[in-house]
Regions:
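Nucleic acid-binding interface residues in structured DNA/RNA-binding domains
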Residues: 1-89
């Protein structure tokens, strides 16, 4: 795994349950604000999608974006996480 992807995955691991961030936000957090597409590619190639929650990263326009298990699964995961978060607070 290259250093760029490691940075992306470390940041994504910090996104709290039930919350989302944008690809642009991730790019800024790793100090590469113009690397939005590269962030998307790194997440597309996430070797551990169950552990590294790439489903919590969405497009800047609010659209859900892609996911290895499909957009419907991504939407369901996000909804489930929001519900769990409400129960925990």
């Amino acid at each position: 795994m290259n250093p760029f992807r490691k940075k992306v995955y470390k940041i994504v691991l910090k996104i709290p349950l039930g919350e989302v961030r944008t690809y642009k936000w991730v790019a800024r957090k790793i100090g590469r604000p113009k690397a939005v597409r590269a962030v998307g590619q790194a997440l597309k190639n996430n070797p551990y999608p169950i552990i590294i929650p790439c489903h919590r990263v969405i497009k800047s326009d609010g659209e859900i974006g892609g996911y290895v298990f499909g957009k419907k699964t991504k939407a369901k995961l996000l909804k489930l996480e929001r519900q769990i978060r409400k129960l925990m607070l």
